[in-house]
Design a protein with these regions (language model features):
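Hydrophobic helix-and-loop "lid/oligomerization" segment in the mid-to-C-terminal part
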Residues: 2-20, 26-56, 63, 71-75, ...
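General beta-strand structural signal in soluble alpha/beta enzymes
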Residues: 16, 46-48, 104-105, 141-143
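Generic enzyme active-site microenvironment
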Residues: 17, 21, 80, 104-105, ...
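Glycine-rich, phosphate-binding/catalytic loops in enzymes
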Residues: 33-34, 95-98, 120, 171
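Active-site cofactor/cluster-binding pocket
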Residues: 61-116
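Solvent-exposed alpha-helices and their adjacent loops that cap or buttress functional pockets
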Residues: 70-72, 94-97, 111, 141-143, ...
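Conserved beta-strand scaffold positions in the cores of enzyme catalytic domains, especially
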Residues: 102-104, 117-119, 217-219, 255
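Short alpha-helices
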Residues: 105-172
Length: 317
């Protein structure tokens, strides 16, 4: 942590990076760190390979740039926030790796130490580290920053339902509420809102899931044609649909989503099972009960490979 604080204090111009397929933790943590550093008088820009309108209600989300041609050598320091693997920087990867002064702030202990400097602590969310950094920098957290950090923590803890939720998480969130975090806005705008098209697509996916009662797992699939047929808004996320089957008693549930660059897979598991071990088979990872990976195969092939990997894992424990 001392080295991290030193780097952030010394740099005058800083570029922050979130991971591709952005989630609440990478977005909330990155934007919160941006605001903290700007309070110190730093010039800060934020980058991500892609954006998602689902986060547009956040007041400073429009600060993100997707310009992968940006000249990153002009910055004193590049910081990857909640990015466990350099490939999740996408088009920014090579420029990041070639920069002389880089920092990775992360809570994925199974990630890669690809930056020149790495701080990685096993916390419920990367936002916990950003909160601690703000304290070390002696920067007062305002209501907007508190809302961003609260949003980030809610995302990675599943609104405090996931097994990574601990007493530290609750203590920090209590502090964030005292600082003015708008928990009602976070819950209403991000976790509650939906559309009829999304509900129809979700129903289709759930009803056509492949269940295996012998080993206790489920694999769901969504094809490009499913997206075209039901046409949900781009900002709606189906990655948490597997939780529905966990609530029915299944041990592990997976959803495989057909995209242009391959099959994006989201894994969820009950507390006592480690779905990250399955995701790791395909070069992915994440958390014990919530992980992901990208498979370069057809949708049918990916579903078959996932089923085999899940069965192999469940047989081994």
């Amino acid at each position: 942590m001392k080295q991290t604080i030193k780097l952030l204090k010394q740099a005058k111009t800083i570029a922050l990076f979130s991971h591709t397929s952005p989630d609440p933790d990478t977005v909330g943590s990155t934007l919160a760190l941006m605001k903290i550093l700007e309070k110190m008088g730093k010039k800060v820009d934020v980058f991500c390979a892609e954006t998602n309108d689902k986060f547009a209600y956040l007041e400073c989300y429009d600060r993100y740039s997707t310009d992968e041609t940006a000249v990153l050598n002009n910055y004193d320091l590049l910081v990857a926030v909640d990015v466990p693997d350099q490939t999740m920087l996408c088009g920014f990867e090579q420029a990041f790796l070639s920069h002389k002064n880089t920092l990775r702030i992360d809570h994925h202990t199974k990630g890669n130490d690809y930056a020149r400097h790495n701080i990685c602590e096993n916390q419920s969310a990367c936002a916990v580290l950003i909160f601690e950094i703000a304290k070390k920098l002696k920067v007062k957290i305002d209501s907007e920053t508190a809302t961003l950090l609260y949003f980030a923590i809610c995302g990675d803890t599943g609104i405090f339902k996931n097994s990574n939720t601990d007493s530290v998480t609750f203590r920090i969130c209590a502090d964030l509420l005292d600082f003015g975090a708008d928990f009602k806005k976070v819950y209403t705008e991000f976790f509650l809102k939906s559309t009829l098209e999304y509900i129809k697509l979700s129903s289709h996916i759930l009803l056509n899931a492949k269940t295996n009662d012998e080993y206790g797992y489920v694999v769901m699939r969504v094809s490009k044609s499913d997206y075209d047929k039901y046409n949900p808004e781009q900002n709606e996320n189906i990655s948490n649909l597997p939780n529905t089957y966990l609530n029915c008693g299944y041990k592990i549930a997976v959803i495989a989503k057909e995209k242009e660059d391959g099959i994006h897979c989201s894994f969820r598991s009950k507390f006592e099972y480690d779905c990250s071990a399955v995701a790791a088979v395909f070069g992915g990872g994440g958390h014990k009960n919530a992980s992901g990976c990208l498979i370069d195969a057809s949708l049918d092939e990916a579903v078959s490979q996932i089923s085999n990997a899940v069965e192999t894992y469940l047989k081994s424990i």
